[in-house]
UniProtKB/Swiss-Prot annotation:
Zn(2+) 2 binds at residues 260, 315, 319, 336, 340. It comes from Macaca fascicularis (Crab-eating macaque). It is found in: Endoplasmic reticulum membrane; Microsome membrane. The keyword Iron applies. The histidine box domains may contain the active site and/or be involved in metal ion binding. GO terms for molecular function: fatty acid 2-hydroxylase activity; free fatty acid 2-hydroxylase activity; heme binding; iron ion binding. Heme binds at residues 43, 69. It is a multi-pass membrane protein. Residues 219-361 form the Fatty acid hydroxylase domain. GO terms for biological process: ceramide biosynthetic process; establishment of skin barrier; fatty acid biosynthetic process; galactosylceramide biosynthetic process; glucosylceramide biosynthetic process; plasma membrane raft organization. Zn(2+) 1 binds at residues 234, 239, 257, 261, 339. The keyword Plastid does not apply. This is Fatty acid 2-hydroxylase.
Length: 372
């Protein structure tokens, strides 16, 4: 027989107040206490919105308005559970706790919302690399991978390969921006020589000259095309549903994108690591060189590469930044968080929602009484 779980810690109202005075952000749901101090800067509604509710019962906030939090958001909250509120019940705050606690006892439907995350009973062993385990999940993989957790992920046994599978955010601009600048300078000089022609592989008589004044337009075309590529890759490759009986396709999905949905705030896995990124970027470069004249294809590639850098930096900021309420990035952050926690089959645009509008995959705005 398995040993009984240890009793939950308990805190008096005065103990909670001392922690709040020290700067911690504790909230409660009924008598259950949660320490959100490490999460406040990630909150999609902004840090101040969450800190303003420190010490309060957030039950009404979870149910809306402005929106009803999803099952994943409630499950996420349970990972910050620290114990129970005890002691003399004073004022409306404590009376609400008693009332909600009684509701929990009589309403079985509320039980899953208060279920504590048990790492020892998860479908995988978090003490071991995950990549070799996820393929065995089969039909359970898709549901499991879309239930986000707060902890970091280890993929490989080898420290070397593990190190190559993650990176810091600033490696992206450090490595790729100098290449963008070099390619832009090099291909602009080629345009300036006046020897760039289109359709020379088909005809010399009707080949079209490409003046250097076209350089900015081609560069911007590359940025624009990247936004479409970003959308298509995210929607059709990253969000493919691997066959439940394919061990290796499940592994492939997890290493490409599933790991990010499982641990959305693992900062070392938010941007593409340089080594695998260089292989993909190299393929795009070769394709453009085969299709277009060198200077034209290279200029479009340079713009696309800058578009990729902007995408990765935007993606990182949407997870770890705190944009001003009502700003473009604030709305983009809210859109992306909904994609992670509730709408994994829509909202595929990261740096822009343009293509979600075009392909009708925009996350719908719903009244707060409906779960988002």
């Amino acid at each position: 027989m398995a040993p009984a779980p240890p009793p939950a810690a308990s805190f008096s109202p005065s103990e909670v107040q001392r922690r709040l005075a020290a700067g911690a952000c504790w909230v409660r749901r009924g008598a259950r206490l949660y320490d959100l101090s490490s999460f406040v800067r990630h909150h999609p509604g902004g840090e101040q919105l969450l800190r303003a509710r420190a010490g309060q019962d957030i039950s009404a906030d979870l149910d809306g308005p402005p929106h009803r939090h999803s099952a994943n958001a409630r499950r996420w909250l349970e990972q910050y559970y620290v114990g129970e509120l005890r002691g003399e019940q004073q004022g409306s705050m404590e009376n609400e706790a008693v009332a909600l606690e009684e509701t929990q006892k009589t309403d079985p439907a509320m039980e899953p919302r208060f279920k504590v995350v048990d790492w020892d009973k998860d479908l995988v062993d978090w003490q071991k690399p995950l990549l070799w385990q996820v393929g065995h999940l089969g039909e359970k993989y898709d549901e499991w991978v879309h239930q986000p957790v707060t902890r970091p992920i280890r993929l490989f046994h080898s420290d070397l390969i593990e190190g190559l599978s993650k990176t810091v955010w600033y490696s992206v601009p450090i490595i790729w921006v100098p290449l963008v600048l070099y390619l832009s300078w090099s291909y602009y000089r080629t345009f300036a020589q006046g020897n760039v022609r289109l359709f020379t592989s088909f005809t010399t008589e009707y080949a079209l000259a490409v003046p250097k004044s076209m350089f900015p337009g081609l560069f911007m075309l590359g940025i624009f095309l990247w936004s479409l590529i970003e959308y298509l890759i995210h929607r059709f490759l990253f969000h493919m549903k691997p066959p439940s009986d394919s061990y290796y396709l499940i592994m492939l999905h997890f290493v490409m994108h599933g790991q990010h949905h499982k641990a959305p705030f693992d900062g070392s896995r938010l941007v593409f690591p340089p080594v695998p990124a260089s292989l993909v970027i190299g393929v795009f470069y070769l394709c453009l060189q085969l299709i277009l004249p060198e200077a034209v294809g290279g200029t479009v590639f340079a713009g696309g590469l800058l578009g990729y850098v902007l995408y990765d930096m935007t993606h990182y900021y949407l997870h770890f930044g705190s944009p001003h309420r009502g700003s473009y990035l604030y709305n983009l952050k809210a859109h992306h968080v909904k994609h992670h926690f509730a709408h994994q089959k829509s909202g595929f645009g990261i740096s822009t929602k343009l293509w979600d509008y075009c392909f009708h995959t925009l996350i719908p705005e719903k009244p707060h009484l409906k779960t988002q």
